[in-house]
Swiss-Prot record:
Function: NDH-1 shuttles electrons from NADH, via FMN and iron-sulfur (Fe-S) centers, to quinones in the respiratory chain. The immediate electron acceptor for the enzyme in this species is believed to be a menaquinone. Couples the redox reaction to proton translocation (for every two electrons transferred, four hydrogen ions are translocated across the cytoplasmic membrane), and thus conserves the redox energy in a proton gradient.
Keyword Translocase (UniProt): yes
Oligomeric and partner information: NDH-1 is composed of 14 different subunits. Subunits NuoA, H, J, K, L, M, N constitute the membrane sector of the complex.
Organism: Bacillus anthracis
Lineage, highest ranks first: Bacteria, Bacillati, Bacillota, Bacilli, Bacillales
Protein's UniProt name: NADH-quinone oxidoreductase subunit K
Designated gene of the protein: nuoK
Length: 104
């Protein structure tokens, strides 16, 4: 049984990160922007796990750091959605273009 080469993991991570970056920079819906940021974080996690497993000195450091990053990403998503709900109640929109002032 052959294993998957490291270049396949890194290529997938680059593709995922580029899709997330493109979505975060071009989309105007705040929920979609948050999802794209999560996609970029998951691409970074894939790199951590790939280098941890397939690097010159395989160890668990990358996998542990990936779990820590997933916990931070979950907290970021919860705070982001809470802010989004508060903004929606105040402005009745979730578009990034219309959220330009701090106090309205």
């Amino acid at each position: 049984m052959s294993s998957v080469p490291a270049s396949a993991y890194l290529t997938l991570a680059i593709i995922l990160f580029c899709i997330g970056l493109f979505g975060a920079l071009t989309k105007r819906n705040t929920v979609i922007v948050l999802v794209c940021i999560e996609l970029m974080l998951n691409a970074a996690n894939l790199n951590f796990v790939a280098f941890s497993k397939l690097g010159l000195f395989p160890n668990l450091t990358g996998q542990i750091f990936s779990l820590f990053t997933m916990a931070v990403a979950a907290a970021e998503a919860a705070v982001g959605l809470a802010i989004l709900i508060a903004l929606y109640r105040n402005r009745t929109t979730v578009h990034v273009d219309e959220m330009d002032t701090l106090k309205g």
